[in-house]
Amino acid sequence: MKKILLAAAAILAANVMTNAQGKFETVELRNSTLHVYYSNDVMADASYIVEGKDALVVLEAPLFKSSQTEFDTYIKKLGKPIETAVIDYHVGGQESQAIVMPQGMHKFTNEGVYAAMMSGFKQSFGDSMVDLAEGDVKEVPFGQTIRLAGVDFRFDKGPANDFPGSMILIDGTACLMHWAPVKAHVNTLQISSAETVGQALEGLKAAENCGATIWLGCHGGIADKAGLDFKIGYLTKIHELLAAKPDAKTFASQLKAEFPGLAGEEGVDALAEALCK
């Protein structure tokens, strides 16, 4: 995960357009309503609101002020207080002083490569960034279910390439991961080495069996079972191609031929260089 974060910092710092023109969609879960915010900012992040009967839970709040303004305006229209903010992978800004994180994530986001990445973002994006979340942090052990705003949230260990991030099963229906399993090529921010292919594949198979019917990502928004099945097959094919020890040029050609016209093809050559070292 450290290599991925460093790569993200370098790539995103090169693009400082942060004006948000995001969009929202809603999905009815078992006992709650899920509101999805697509920021359309430089990070292409997605943020989430889980609306219970009397209160809200915010997950992965936006990082930029323009996005946060849109997000907060939408929240106010819902007319319910924010009970808790959940930070799984992305530290942002939110009004709640009660913060929940998966086990180990609080320390991880406050030191080493993650702290350096956020410092780099601050230097690049300056005042366009929100003040990062501060409050009383509660960490949730993996395998534990907690109840927030009257809704169950189960925290399971996420894929090893995203550790210490968690897979969070929301209301027995929606599984939040770092990357939604959408029908597109992976890039070097998701998969940075041959080893991480197997880790990501193992994580998706765990997500398939977690009880969810939709899968969410901090990047990519909402994916259905067809998207999940595609991504499992896609990573399985990458694993098979790598087993033959191809050079980067051969691997890139083979992957493009296996998935012609698939979104994200412009990043396949860079992916091949990373995986075929």
Residues of each region from the PLM?
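Boundary at the C-terminal end of the N-terminal hydrophobic targeting segment
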Residues: 10, 18-22
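Active-site HxH/HxHxD metal-binding segment of metal-dependent hydrolases
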Residues: 73-145, 242-243
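Ligand/cofactor pocket segment of small-molecule handling proteins
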Residues: 138-200
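Sec-dependent N-terminal signal peptides
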Residues: 4-13
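Conserved beta-strand hairpin/beta-sheet module of binuclear metal-dependent hydrolase folds
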Residues: 23-77, 166-179
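Divalent-metal (often Zn2+) His-rich catalytic cores of metallo-beta-lactamase-fold enzymes
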Residues: 197-254
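C-terminal regulatory/interaction regions
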Residues: 21, 247-277
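Active-site neighborhood of phospho(di)ester-bond hydrolases with catalytic His/Asp-centered motifs
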Residues: 58-62, 81-105, 175-180, 210-221
